[in-house]
């Protein structure tokens, strides 16, 4: 069901560069550890980039969009046509991630991997096996061929970013109903009750959240999904095209030794899928923020992740990762630019 490349081992981060970065941090004109997570992320980037001077300047953002048949069950506060309308907004520069990417100097690529849009759209790459998933409350969301195709779409999207020579990459998503698909995937893979995963998504009230959880619970039962179900079968049963594309893109980026700055709940579920398919990609993941979406904390815990910021964001679109990017840039600037005790003729800590 999934292509063979997705199992290929990802390179390991450079232990030598990690040790060198740690040694440099110990020599900078500050108490060791005084810059907290800024020190940690700089050291991690140095190891991932195998660089004496880590960087976070060249950062392409790739946004994957897809529609969801499950939206017919009233699991979103917005109608399905919003997905395609938002594609025009992304391409026109009016969406949050478009503004953030422009402000940060990040190239933005929008990829339609499965919206209901018919034909080409200006400013959007179209690479999809079908127009939307099927309603997984009544049938399989996708065929095995769909799952394979869209994972390859993630690989192709990563290949298109090579000309940017990325320091790291950011992936994002758009798709009405995709928090339902993400919650269903997470509930299956983690053996969690849907009620413990489901959040407000685009703004559901308590009644809407309960309905959403029941839809997922019934679907997991219908498809016989458990923690023992192979990942590819879970994806075919309840997956989303953009979620699978991001999982493929995460593995493909890690195989190229590109760090991935992971966004919120839905991208974290894609990261969970990626690590289940290829555990060697896990060291290449940096986690940007803790979303206000209820299930995000559960998924972060399963991944052993420590996000950088917590601003109650729940938009998606890679907006949280983009918001955290300046922190990575400042961490690199401090690591690379601060003087050592010797350079500044400042006395170091006494033994």
UniProtKB/Swiss-Prot annotation:
Pathway: Nucleoside biosynthesis; alpha-ribazole biosynthesis; alpha-ribazole from 5,6-dimethylbenzimidazole: step 1/2. GO terms for biological process: cobalamin biosynthetic process. The keyword Membrane does not apply. Its EC number is 2.4.2.21. It is an enzyme of class 2 (transferase). Pfam families: DBI_PRT. GO terms for molecular function: nicotinate-nucleotide-dimethylbenzimidazole phosphoribosyltransferase activity. Gene3D superfamilies: 1.10.1610.10, 3.40.50.10210. Keywords: Cobalamin biosynthesis, Glycosyltransferase, Transferase. It catalyses: 5,6-dimethylbenzimidazole + nicotinate beta-D-ribonucleotide = alpha-ribazole 5'-phosphate + nicotinate + H(+). The active site is at residue 317. NCBIfam families: cobT_DBIPRT, PRK00105.1. Belongs to the CobT family. PANTHER family: NICOTINATE-NUCLEOTIDE--DIMETHYLBENZIMIDAZOLE PHOSPHORIBOSYLTRANSFERASE. Catalyzes the synthesis of alpha-ribazole-5'-phosphate from nicotinate mononucleotide (NAMN) and 5,6-dimethylbenzimidazole (DMB). This is Nicotinate-nucleotide--dimethylbenzimidazole phosphoribosyltransferase. It comes from Bradyrhizobium sp. (strain ORS 278). The gene is cobT.
